């Protein structure tokens, strides 16, 4: 069908739902207000006229040649057939007129509804000259009664020219491909110089100029040329160098929204409609641009969802208006943002204007408030080391050997004293059972147990420094001075230490003191180097076969060299040259208690791990190489949410123990852990348990499961723990912010499960107290009679388990869509059971461009439609909405700070160090500028 409008003083653009085929054109020439109607019009003087020509596929033409009224909206007028005329070929054309005073015709009701639809849609198509009326050759309307039938007799599948949209889809694939053959701009410039005539490049040479040589590509290049011209509203067959650069810049723009814009410009040369298969192709391309393999697999389902939404009336379920899709995909969303309240903003601005000295003192004060635990511990440590160093320096400065060896001897002995102290102290932070116990005491309020591993690393730096100073002072200064001393000085000051015969340099080294010292230096340097972050995390890539010298295994086994170091240290300490009295050989005094404590812990852990017998109940291997092990809970195994255990699998390694966060709740009757493959040991775990798993379920690519009963036996598993972690202190805060990156979410899953169990228990107790519970008691640790509300009110308060945490905000940031499967169960449980909104969950998928970016608009639309229809997020497969990109952490903290004024909020983080530093800095800034306080805690492994 084609429609042609002509009239005066009407500048509206109309869109048509009547059009089923052909093209739709409009023309509104600029005419004066005294426009005279055509002779054929039947309107009176002063009326505005509008002529509408509608051509149906059957050949029928309807002329609407009179409109009464000056309003631009025709939807409120009445429809009346004013004339009918036969064409020369025997077909009949109808002339319809709208008149405010005309009599409403029943036969025209359906037509009026369709015309009203045109007015409501209001789409703007490119303005072109109206074609000459086509004389129909078949089909005619004999009277007005047949008009509704004629309007409704449209083909179920329009006779459209599909090549336009299909070529545009092909073009979208083409420019999205990295192997599209488009050359560099310098080559394009050179091609322009050879192909241009008088500074212009003709359309016929455009394909060759941008490097498209074959015939199919040339046809596409011509379509592309026309589309780019239409976008710039120019209709030319040649372009200059500047225009060519603009064309080339858009073609090579890798952003998906730029490619979509080209697609829509190419498709507009067709019929303005797009099919379900074509929508599917766009979804596939959008999913590829955002690295979403699962979305590609369900592209057909989501394409049908879009078709259903954009064509709700069902008239053309296999087509939608292209304009709808274009507006949807290329229109930027207004993203919600959180800003600081005006009072906080004003306060921050005023503070910047104050004296710099005052601000520095204020920052120092806030730093002391945030880090006072660390500060007093480190201060005490430095004071002790300084006192030991000076005490030993003073002691040896009054020895006879000082007259020969001088301050080299003093420096060596001072360093040795701090070395002995630190070799004893470094064992305490790794006595995990002791630290776990101390966390539950009053010491946790003044000692930063969260920083045990960091303190352990800091002490190691002090040990290496003291060791190098001690060894260098002896080997490079003291020994040469002994050899260079005069016979008189030697006999007077040194003979009582080294004997009558002056030793040689080799003789000084080739003694128990020298040999043990050199071996200790070598072993400690090896252990220290392989324990560094770059080696332990395998960030330093070495060529084969030296690649085995880095990684966790190298760190783990090299640390066992330190057992030998402690033995050698005792031998070294009792074989001193300058001390012969046993009570002055103090190395054993420093080491006695810490070594006994550490050895006792190791023995205790060995036997306890054998007593904790666990049976594997369920194994699930998720995409992304994550193994979930659910095992029976030992009877005496008591733990807190947020803690972790060490795991050993003898079939993989009989010596290696690895820490993993517990992901089950203390109230559950089982233990569960999540293990992600990152090294040799975790790879061995995956292989060992993959053997007993079933094949993947339909629709769950890569998912392996194994449940009891199972024909094959599971590999043996040993556990040791539980051990304390920063996350276990969440109960101290009324409001907590939990932030996990990837597998770093595992410490917080146990917390979420624990909170959920408490929420459910609290709801059950509330129902019982209100009289809605019909049971006589609740079978739990906090059971009580529930016969009526009065009886419930008599229950002691100590027997009621209250929920300390009032609000929990969980932010999970992951790169892979399949990661959401790991904790799908708990997320759905929270969404179903948390009626009061205690837990607020936010999932972020970083492989998708952030919200508001046109490259993710299509995905946002599909996500919204599917959630509205099915209540499920298309990315996570849960009821929790997935956000795109990365959270704006400053806005997140600002939102929480505004919502919970004067509160003390615990921020718990597990992930890469870079984000941990950012969150720590933001917490420090908010503590300075706001009235809400954030306490930052980072998981250390």
Curated annotation (Swiss-Prot):
GO biological process: response to osmotic stress
Biased composition (Low complexity): 36-45
Membrane-topology annotation of the record: Multi-pass membrane protein
Keyword Membrane among record annotations: yes
Positions contributing to Ca(2+) binding: 269, 271, 273, 278
Record GO terms (molecular function): metal ion binding; oxidoreductase activity, acting on NAD(P)H, oxygen as acceptor; peroxidase activity
Keyword Metal-binding in annotation: yes
EC nos: 1.11.1.-, 1.6.3.-
Cell compartment(s), UniProt: Membrane
Protein name (Swiss-Prot/TrEMBL): Probable respiratory burst oxidase homolog protein I
InterPro entries found in the cross-reference section: Cyt_b245_heavy_chain, EF-hand-dom_pair, FAD-bd_8, FAD-bd_FR_type, Fe3_Rdtase_TM_dom, Fe_red_NAD-bd_6, FNR_nucleotide-bd, NADPH_Ox
Role this protein plays: Calcium-dependent NADPH oxidase that generates superoxide.
